[in-house]
């Protein structure tokens, strides 16, 4: 099962936490749709800010949004202008009071979503897929990863028939629950069609009582 299941969901409750931290009874569907709208809006609004994860917490009529990004300065803006504008936009979108926390990702080369997104953008820029994948793997291993696996699927280099190419370095123990494995799936929209990019990064083992995080510094607005 470890080879098939999403590694992030497989480890929730063991070494990972939920990205949506709230409970609802009859309003569950409304809150879930609101979460999806918030995530989609932030993804579109901060497309160039290297945003990896958006965590949402709820309390009464208040929504706390934590944005994990490798470029906190771009999200915050000069004197906090950008994050304040974003907060007002989310207030209008949800009709609730929104509080935004900016969490800096200290090592973006160890974040699967940012690595996969980087590979996807290079594929869109017509860079050879092998070069993009191997470059990302080398940077991740230099940053301290214990192992990394990347996979690209689709009409590679414009070939008539789609295929899957994958490369790995180090070890990626998918069956080990205490293994801190970050996983991401991204898309590259090329002139030949859509390419799927999957990334697995093994960052070491974690005790179940200690939830590992790639984010060290946190600021709020």
Swiss-Prot record:
* One Pfam entry name: KH_2
**Among its keywords, does the record have rRNA-binding?**
yes
Q: Which domain of life is it from?
A: Bacteria
Q: Which residues form the KH type-2 domain?
A: 38-106
Task: Provide a Gene Ontology MF annotation, just one.
Answer: mRNA binding
Q: Which residues form the signal peptide?
A: none
Q: Name one GO biological process term.
A: translation
Q: Does the keyword Ribonucleoprotein apply?
A: yes
Q: Which Gene3D superfamilies match?
A: 3.30.300.20, Ribosomal protein S3, C-terminal domain (3.30.1140.32)
Query: What PROSITE patterns does the annotation carry?
Result: KH_TYPE_2, RIBOSOMAL_S3
Do you know which CDD domains this protein is assigned to?
KH-II_30S_S3
Concerning NCBIfam families, the annotation shows: rpsC_bact (TIGR01009)
Q: Tell me the function of this protein.
A: Binds the lower part of the 30S subunit head. Binds mRNA in the 70S ribosome, positioning it for translation.
Subunit structure as annotated in this protein's UniProt entry: Part of the 30S ribosomal subunit. Forms a tight complex with proteins S10 and S14.
* Identification of the protein by name: Small ribosomal subunit protein uS3
Report the source organism. Limosilactobacillus reuteri (strain DSM 20016) (Lactobacillus reuteri)
Q: What is the lineage of its organism?
A: Bacteria, Bacillati, Bacillota, Bacilli, Lactobacillales
């Amino acid at each position: 099962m470890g080879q098939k299941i999403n590694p992030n969901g497989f480890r929730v409750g063991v070494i990972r936490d939920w990205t949506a931290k709230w409970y609802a009874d009859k309003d569950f569907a409304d809150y879930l749709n609101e979460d999806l709208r918030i995530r989609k809006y932030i993804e579109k609004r901060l497309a160039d800010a290297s945003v990896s994860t958006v965590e949402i917490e709820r309390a009464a009529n208040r929504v706390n949004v934590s944005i994990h990004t490798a470029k906190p300065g771009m999200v915050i803006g000069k004197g906090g202008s950008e994050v304040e504008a974003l907060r007002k936009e989310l207030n209008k979108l949800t009709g609730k009071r929104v509080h935004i926390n900016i969490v800096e990702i200290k090592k973006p080369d160890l974040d699967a979503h940012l690595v996969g997104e980087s590979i996807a953008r290079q594929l869109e820029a017509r860079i050879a897929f092998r070069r993009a994948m191997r470059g990302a793997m080398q940077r991740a291993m230099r940053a301290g990863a214990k192992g990394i696996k990347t996979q690209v699927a689709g009409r590679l280099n414009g070939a008539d028939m789609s295929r899957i190419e994958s490369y790995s370095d180090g070890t990626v123990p998918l069956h080990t629950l205490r293994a801190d494995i970050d996983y991401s799936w991204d898309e590259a929209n090329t002139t030949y069609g859509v390419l799927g990019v999957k990334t697995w990064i093994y960052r070491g083992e974690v005790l179940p009582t200690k939830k590992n995080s790639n984010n060290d510094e946190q600021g709020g607005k």
